[in-house]
């Protein structure tokens, strides 16, 4: 029963992760525009955010977002503003984009890690999703609250690891495409505009979205 439950969870998780959304689209655009290292750093940041969301859900804090329209809206609009800021910054700053052949400095990679982390944490729909999704695969009549929380964390860890694997594959594939396109200056400039517009669009989409 447990093995079947985990198998179903993995299958359902992969279906969710592969579905187009802000996280995988962000990794895709970073990989195309700025190369493998930047995209991977962004992916690690986002998956770290998933672990934090799991922890918050396990201790019950995410339930506040599910119940409070005010708390949900505050975080949602903060996330939308942050995405909009990243998009405008990409559109205005040519320094944001370097050739994928150049190795980004470590400080730059840390910056993109924290951008990915912040972007994920400021999306309240992730927290609400975890509250709705993970309990479906919990063991009924768990012996203790502590055991239930540990299982919640284990499922969240599996989801984060699956996300990291998928996002890493997207980052590597996108960086190969970006490396070829960036050799043409016109394509490189188009990639900058594409990334900026995608981020602004994701911000607008988040701002206009509901809880579902």
Question: What do the predicted segments below correspond to?
Answer:
Residues 7, 11, 106-118, 150-157, ...:
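Alpha-helical membrane-protein architecture signal
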Residues 67-96, 160-170, 178-212:
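Selective transmembrane alpha-helices of multi-pass membrane proteins
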Residues 22-25, 84, 128-131, 164, ...:
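Residues that mark transmembrane-helix kinks and helix-interface sites
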Residues 122-127:
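Selected transmembrane alpha-helices and immediately adjacent juxtamembrane segments
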Residues 37-112, 173, 204:
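Membrane helix-loop-helix hairpins that form the core translocation module of multi-pass transporters
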Residues 2-73, 132-160, 178:
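Juxtamembrane transmembrane-helix termini in multi-pass membrane transport proteins
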Residues 14-17, 120-121, 160-168:
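Residue-level hotspots within the lipid-embedded alpha helices of multi-pass solute transporters
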